[in-house]
Amino acid sequence: MKLTIIRLEKFSDQDRIDLQKIWPEYSPSSLQVDDNHRIYAARFNERLLAAVRVTLSGTEGALDSLRVREVTRRRGVGQYLLEEVLRNNPGVSCWWMADAGVEDRGVMTAFMQALGFTAQQGGWEKC
């Protein structure tokens, strides 16, 4: 089975279970999506392994809550997820990712810089 990146527009029961494992701090009812508030996820064997929330506003995009399930980390899933999010939103010329809730800022800085982001006060930017 191939790892695929998807935009979640409707949540299946299994999606809800997997999202609770990825983001235990969010209630399912708080994960609302529309054209400007999106959730992208990495799926493998019908299970979500990682997810990120995306907020779009004109040519600007904000990423938050990027999380890869612990057992899947360090395998390129997060990188593939973000690369596909950026590729699927070509109208966005400037991206921002806040560092709120980041477990290890040093690790995340290296990760974000590998994707072309630069460290800023409070997060990372790619314009």
Curated annotation (Swiss-Prot):
One of its GO terms (molecular function) is acyltransferase activity, transferring groups other than amino-acyl groups. CoA binds at L66, R67, V68, T72, R73, R74, R75, G76, V77, G78, Q79. Disruption phenotype: Deletion mutants are deficient in the biosynthetic pathway for pantothenate. It holds the Pfam family PanZ. Gene3D superfamilies: 3.40.630.30. Controls both the activation and catalytic activity of PanD in a coenzyme A (CoA)-dependent fashion. Binding of CoA or a derivative to PanZ leads to interaction with PanD, which promotes the processing and activation of pro-PanD, and subsequent substrate-mediated inhibition of the active form of PanD. Inhibition of PanD activity is probably the primary metabolic role of PanZ, allowing negative feedback regulation of pantothenate biosynthesis by CoA. Interacts with PanD in the presence of CoA. Forms a heterooctameric complex composed of four PanD subunits and four PanZ subunits. Monomer in solution. GO terms for biological process: pantothenate biosynthetic process; protein processing; zymogen activation. NCBIfam families: matur_PanM. Residues 1-127 form the N-acetyltransferase domain. Residues 43-48, 66-76 are annotated as: Interaction with PanD. The keyword Coiled coil does not apply. Keywords: Pantothenate biosynthesis. Activation of PanD processing occurs even at low CoA concentrations. In contrast, full inhibition of PanD catalytic activity only occurs at sufficiently high CoA concentrations. This is PanD regulatory factor. Belongs to the PanZ/PanM family. InterPro entries: Acyl_CoA_acyltransferase, GNAT_dom, PanZ, PanZ_GNAT.
